[in-house]
Amino acid sequence: GRTPRADFHHGQVGTMNSGRLHFILRNNSIMKNLILLSDRNNYMFQTTHILAIALLSILTVMSSRADEPAPFPIWKSGAMLAEAEKLPEISNVDFHVIKKWDKKSDGYTFLHGVGLAQHKGKLYASFGHNKGAENTVSEEAQYRVSEDGGRTWGALKVIDAGDEPDLAVSHGVFHVHEGALWAFHGAYYGKMKRVHTRAYRLDEKTSTWEKHGIVAEDGFWPMNQPVRMADGNWIMPGFAAGPYSSKGVFPAAIAISHGDNFGKWDLVKIPVAKGLKNMWGESAIFVDGKTIFNISRYGTAAVALVAKSEDSGRNWSPSSASNLPMTTSKPAAGILSTGQRYLVCTTAKGNGGKRTPLTIALSEPNENRFSKIFVIRRSRHDGRPGESADKLSLSYPYAMEYDGNLYVGYSNNGGRNGNLNSAELAVIPIKSLIVLE
């Protein structure tokens, strides 16, 4: 009753009961299946574990991105954004020099913040001027007057040199209203402490400036001229300044008049989007009825920050990064008589923080998104008025429309370090800025 069996250890053949053999073979098959099933389950576990980790990572990234606001669409979707070298230039611009940097002759080092106004047939240009360092107590608000559209300029004159101990008055903005010329200038004590805005009105008979005192406090420094809103008040863009810090957040701000009373302005500081750091929020605006767009300077990245108000500047969305690159410098903005919105600064693809070339971004008529950029001037400017160099800064623009032209004042450091600037002027025919749909 015995059958041969295999002795696997010694290679010998013996006998084994057939039922026992069947039992062993069956159990051996079960073990193999169990091992295969275990391996399969282990593989599935490892795969599931890897997929779970990957999914968790994706969800974490999506969650973090969800916390970041989408770029504000101030640049029109689908419009081509070119590099600086490929941007078209405006060919028929007239250039003039308002004040040449000439320390050897006049002792002035710092110059910045051109302001412009046309008043009773004359062109006024103001700026902050200092024989010492920038943002020190020796700074003065000065101006010059041209009677031929900016080709030649009269003597340097003073709006306010600061008549209190430790008081400095610097650059500001003009405002023409009901036949009178007003000026609003940033001022401070010491080195950028207690920053505020002071108002002045030109006395036509004496050619001196009447002082109307402090009209806005809590750091407000105006950067561009007031614009009338739909509610009858005027809105003036600027920022809330203080002693500079590379890590500080100095937000964009606006001041709102009490009707035509320019002796009192309500300050509104614009909130800042979460995560924004190193902001020096010098700002500009354009006004579309009750809707106001504020475009301001960033510090961490070369991108325009944009905020929006739907109630004539009383409440704002936070200043947040837009989809338009812009150098880290003060912009100028507004609406042309054509209905086009404009932004003067340096806006070009991949240009970083370079303050050249000086550009103007334009929208199509009655649109609130820019879609075209022109170069006003580049660094090399040989044979034409103004300083020329391979590398220089063309910054801090101020713009106003008058008699078919857009007048743009700006600083030019001529390749010198810091704001050792000349004040220059570009006069652009409005017909050169028309963007066809």
For each of these PLM feature ranges, what is it?
Residues 2-4, 15:
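Short linear motifs in low-complexity or flexible loops
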Residues 34-51:
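Bacterial N-terminal signal peptides that target proteins for export
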Residues 51-60:
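Bacterial N-terminal signal peptides
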Residues 62-65:
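Sec/Tat signal peptide C-region and signal peptidase I cleavage site
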Residues 67-109, 117-167, 176-328, 335-390, ...:
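Beta-rich carbohydrate-recognition and catalytic domains
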Residues 285, 399-400:
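Eukaryotic scaffold repeat domains enriched in small/polar residues
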